[in-house]
Regions:
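Secondary-structure end/capping motifs
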Residues: 167-231
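Bilobed "Venus flytrap"/periplasmic-binding protein-like clamshell domains
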Residues: 1-20, 27, 73-120, 124-128, ...
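Hydrophobic residues within well-ordered alpha-helices
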Residues: 37-38, 232
Length: 253
């Protein structure tokens, strides 16, 4: 049975909405899934795009899936009372790798400290970022929006990676994941209400949130990913930009 990683945030609800596949589902925050995939404890998982790039010689990608946004994403936020041009320290979450590097790309002069320490701004991701937007009146800066304003491209936060040697059945699993996303898109109200019951956010809020998320790994997303990796390399966060290697040749999403 395929060991399938699942990010333990509400952003996975569309992907697992009606997943028709026999899998062992293993949940964790992004950095935990990164570690477990590279340790051989998972057969496929959505992992931080920067961690894929750092380990691309050991991994292959599902060609039709990612987690991205075209502009604002809501669940990746810099919270700061200071204007961004005046931010010199950022307290960063231990749960994300891509967002931390994206912060370095967007704010190259800011030093990073662990979340909880005194800083000009703090980086929140996932459900913590969504909750903060409800509860904290401090200005929030959406990293997906900031990225698009800088590059004009989508920001790919995660890719679906598989360690070599590859487990059998991955192409069929990708088909099932894509089918689940398509059904979720066709039933947005039901998706939002079910996710509201599971995660506690208002259904209307989740419906708007899910509209901002993208799961197809098309040409624009790949261009956005490669641009991010090139800028990460310039920032000293990546030794080299890898060629993308896939489980199989891409088919229309």
């Amino acid at each position: 049975m395929i060991r399938l990683g699942r990010i333990s945030y509400v952003n996975m609800a569309p992907v697992f909405y009606r997943l028709e596949a026999e899998v062992e589902e293993i949940q964790g925050v992004p950095t935990e899934l990164n570690r477990r995939l590279l340790a051989g404890e998972l057969d496929v998982a959505p992992i931080s795009s920067i961690e894929y790039a750092r380990n691309a010689d050991r991994l292959r990608l599902l060609p039709r899936l990612c987690v991205s946004s075209e502009g604002a994403v809501d669940s990746i936020q810099l919270v700061s009372r200071k204007p961004l041009e005046h931010v010199r320290t950022v307290a960063v979450t231990p749960e994300s790798a891509t967002s931390v590097v994206l912060t370095k790309v967007l704010l190259p002069d800011a030093d990073h400290v662990p979340l909880g320490e005194e800083a000009d701004a703090k980086l929140l991701i996932g459900d913590a970022a969504l909750k903060s937007a409800f509860e904290d009146p401090t200005p929030h800066y959406d990293l997906g929006r900031l990225w698009q304003e800088r590059t004009g491209l989508p920001m790919v936060f995660a890719v679906w990676a598989c360690p070599e040697p590859l487990q059998g059945g991955l192409a069929e699993l990708e088909d099932a994941l894509v089918a689940s996303v398509r059904l979720a898109r066709a039933e947005p109200e039901r998706l939002a209400f079910e996710a509201s019951d599971s995660y506690g956010y208002p259904a209307g809020f989740l419906a708007r949130y899910f509209e901002k998320l993208r799961y197809s790994f098309g040409p624009r997303e790949r261009a956005g990913l490669m641009t991010f990796l090139e800028l990460a390399q310039e920032a000293g966060e990546l030794d080299e930009v890898p060629e993308l290697r896939f489980v199989r040749e891409a088919v229309p999403a």
